[in-house]
């Protein structure tokens, strides 16, 4: 493998494809329960909604689109939505970001979760006022009694410490004919920071003493490392070390 003026020679040997499948290892334990409603969103006393999704926005505007989905199903203003994306400690495991699945798969899951939340909050208001659920409606995050419009309460006042409920996979979704947010041309929330250079691109992010690792992979599935000659790489300016763990190989600089 060429790198600057140095050279690293790596030879691979190939075995059956099944061998590669057997080395996948165990997945780490999940930190949050995907079926818990509180995993997906929180609402504060000011009616601001924080949404947690396991996807990230790679520049395609999915943060804006997912915010629209959440605002629509919750019947809250778009600007009341705050999005936490891809934080592995606090967001649900929604697999990878890619293959056009963020909206198709991740958006569908978020839609069901927020529809569940909306139904749960309406139910709480109905119990509080001792009225039928069908008598209530939501406008901008405020539950209103249609028979007595002066009787109203915000989501933030209803939420308490949390939902403590499971996501209802059969939650009633809002009809497309009632959409007020989804389908609207809303300015993307990620653009301002990008055009003003405030956005911290990962390529420009550097901490004091931070190192870079280049992983060296075979072009063939199932290959194993037969030998490594890193004498040339060691001569490259900035070289720190070669790391080999079984068939994993990387150069740190």
Question: Where on the chain are the PLM-derived regions?
Answer:
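Cofactor-binding beta-sheet edge motifs in enzyme active sites
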Residues: 2-14, 19-253
């Amino acid at each position: 493998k060429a790198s600057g003026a140095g050279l690293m020679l790596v030879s691979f040997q190939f075995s059956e494809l099944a061998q590669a499948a057997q080395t996948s290892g165990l997945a780490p334990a999940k930190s949050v329960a995907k079926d818990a409603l509180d995993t997906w969103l929180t609402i504060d006393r000011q009616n601001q909604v924080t949404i947690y999704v396991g996807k990230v926005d790679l520049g395609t505007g999915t943060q804006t689109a997912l915010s629209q989905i959440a605002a629509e199903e919750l019947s809250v203003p778009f600007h009341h939505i705050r999005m936490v994306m891809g934080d592995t400690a606090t967001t649900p495991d929604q697999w990878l970001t890619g293959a056009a699945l963020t909206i198709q798969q991740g958006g569908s899951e978020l839609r069901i979760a927020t529809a569940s939340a909306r139904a749960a909050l309406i139910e709480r208001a109905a119990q509080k006022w001792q009225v039928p659920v069908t008598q209530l409606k939501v406008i901008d995050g405020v539950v209103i009694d249609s028979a007595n419009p002066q009787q109203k309460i915000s989501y933030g006042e209803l939420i308490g410490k949390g939902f403590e409920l499971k996501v209802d996979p059969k939650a009633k979704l809002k009809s497309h004919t009632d959409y007020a947010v989804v389908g609207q041309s809303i300015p993307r929330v990620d653009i301002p920071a990008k055009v003003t250079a405030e956005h911290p691109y990962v390529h420009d992010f550097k901490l004091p003493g931070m190192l870079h690792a280049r992983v060296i992979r075979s072009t063939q599935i199932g290959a194993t490392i037969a030998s490594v000659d890193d004498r040339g790489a060691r001569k490259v300016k900035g070289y720190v070390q070669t790391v080999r763990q079984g068939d994993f190989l990387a150069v740190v600089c």
